[in-house]
Structure formats: structure tokens, C-alpha cells
Curated annotation (Swiss-Prot):
The keyword Signal applies. It is found in: Secreted. Disulfide bonds join 48-82, 54-75, 62-80, 66-81. Residues 1-24 form the signal peptide. Its main location: secreted. One of its GO terms (biological process) is killing of cells of another organism. The keyword Transferase does not apply. Keywords: Antimicrobial, Disulfide bond, Fungicide, Plant defense, Secreted, Signal. This is Putative defensin-like protein 104. Belongs to the DEFL family.
Length: 91
């Protein structure tokens, strides 16, 4: 028995979906995908500065400015903080 074209197409889409999902996961300090097991803690080497847009809820300029020095940017209160790994808050 062979595989029908419908089965092959479904299999290929499934493989493509799984590969793209794993590829898009945030990276941890060890350089492997973050599956939610390891938690990132706030590190002192974060670079933070006061940003006028953060209190107004405008995080896009913060993200854009941080791309020059790090991977991500996030507004924390009135400060924009740049960092290299997406933080996971402790539960």
C-alpha cells in the first residue's frame, strides 16, 4: 500500500509546522530553545533608561531603540529596558 497524496500533503504540513514552531521559540542562556522549563531572571547587565513613551503605553519606540544594542526592549514603568533574552516572570 502506498500513501495517498492527501496523506503526504498533511504529513509535510505537519512537519513544516513543528519545525517552524521550534525555530521561533525564544533562546535561553544555554543557546537552546526555551521550552518554558528554564526561567530567565532579571540580570544586572540590563540596559535601562527613562523613556517618555513608556508611561503613555508606547512600547514600539523602546523596542526599536533597543535593537541597536540588544535583542529586545520592554517598558518597565517609566523605563525602557534592553536585554538579550525574553524574560519569564517568576510564578
Amino acid at each position: 500500500m502506498g500513501f495517498s497524496p492527501k496523506t503526504l500533503v498533511a504529513f509535510c504540513w505537519t512537519v513544516l509546522f513543528i519545525i517552524s514552531f521550534v525555530h521561533c521559540l525564544p533562546m535561553t542562556h544555554g543557546g537552546k530553545p526555551g521550552y518554558g522549563i528554564e526561567r530567565t531572571i532579571i540580570r544586572p547587565e540590563w540596559r535601562c533608561y527613562v523613556d517618555e513613551g513608556c508611561p503613555k503605553g508606547q512600547g514600539a519606540p523602546c523596542e526599536k531603540n533597543c535593537k541597536n544594542v540588544a535583542d529586545y526592549g520592554i517598558c518597565i514603568g517609566i523605563k525602557c529596558c534592553c536585554f538579550d533574552v525574553i524574560p519569564v516572570p517568576p510564578t
